[in-house]
Amino acid sequence: MTRSLKKNPFVANHLLRKIEKLNTKAEKEIIITWSRASTIIPTMIGHTIAIHNGREHLPIYITDRMVGHKLGEFSPTINFRGHAKNDNRSRR
């Protein structure tokens, strides 16, 4: 179910403050965050945000095509290595 249009998109306050501060200084640096639920808004375009995936922070460069998506969509948490190999030969 999508978020109601009456409400604004969710962005963590600490993340929003860091973005605004960097925009006023016109500086670019990596912003570290654990807030995977935050929505990408147009003021974040051009920044690099390191998003936590449960083990490490993955740096993601924000482009205009990412606006409206959540930060967590761009840092995968599970590394699928394939199904277990069939070992019927070893059982015989």
UniProtKB/Swiss-Prot annotation:
Pfam families membership: Ribosomal_S19
MF-aspect GO terms: rRNA binding; structural constituent of ribosome
GO cellular component: chloroplast; mitochondrial small ribosomal subunit
GO annotation (BP), single: translation
UniProt keywords, alphabetically: Chloroplast, Plastid, Ribonucleoprotein, Ribosomal protein, RNA-binding, rRNA-binding
InterPro entries: Ribosomal_uS19, Ribosomal_uS19_bac-type, Ribosomal_uS19_CS, Ribosomal_uS19_SF
Residues annotated as transmembrane: none
Main subcellular localisation: plastid
Protein's cellular compartments: Plastid, Chloroplast
PROSITE patterns documented for this protein: RIBOSOMAL_S19
Family per record: Belongs to the universal ribosomal protein uS19 family.
HAMAP family the record matches: Ribosomal_uS19
Functional summary from the UniProt entry: Protein S19 forms a complex with S13 that binds strongly to the 16S ribosomal RNA.
Protein name: Small ribosomal subunit protein uS19c
